[in-house]
Amino acid sequence: MRRTLLATLFFLVLIAIWHFLVQAGIYSPVLLPSPQSVGEYLLGAARDGTLLQATSVTVRRLLVGYFIGILIGLPLGLFTSAFKFVEDTIGVMALGLQTLPSVCWIPLALLWFGQTESAMLFVVIMGTVWSVVIATDTGVRNIPPIFARAAKTMGSRGLHKWTKVILPSSLPFLVSGMKQGWAFAWRSLMAAEIYVTILTGFGLGHLLHYGRELHAMDQVIGVMLVIIVIGLLTDKILFSPVERFLHNRWGTGLR
């Protein structure tokens, strides 16, 4: 309760400082709209359906690209940890590509797929898959050796060993990798939606782009706040409960 009150007070102070900067004329309302202006935009966009439609389009793209990235990254990570040749090739490539900013994939996506939905999905997948590969590989390699020896002593080999020992033991690393992959996917999609203009549906990134084009800073900041809230809700509703479960079950994790 005390933590909630302190956090609420902190954000109220931030809003008060924001309001003061606008009212004191330190920043022009054109560059920094007041909290009231941003709130009015969000209410208007919610009432006419613009915000809901853009959010649903963005979340749908994110989920599709993210899960495809997991389906590709998880097996690749397992192969990387199991075979030396794959580690020296796919593993090195994954490590290098993870450091590449997601926005760098946009020119390739536009050249290969054009102004299409596939271009944005490609950028999201590229932002996700390499984090999952590295996290899976790291998770398998950080399993306590005693687990592997005990499994071998008890006759666990092959698929049984992987499904009953290796994967469960590496779950904390896998969840961390999926969480990181989600963050990279989210950023990748925002960059893609800002740069890729398509007619199949306008997402939150498009609202950011058009807000900038129209110098509507209330729209830009309002959409940014929506993006932040979605990210926080995803962490609290999806990843935090899983991390708490892993901590209680195995004594690992961050919480």
Report each predicted region and the residues it spans.
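Transmembrane-helix boundary motif in ABC transporter permease subunits
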Residues: 64-94
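N-terminal signal-anchor transmembrane alpha helix
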Residues: 2-26
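C-terminal transmembrane helix and the adjacent membrane-cytosol boundary/short C-terminal tail
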Residues: 84, 141, 171, 176-179, ...
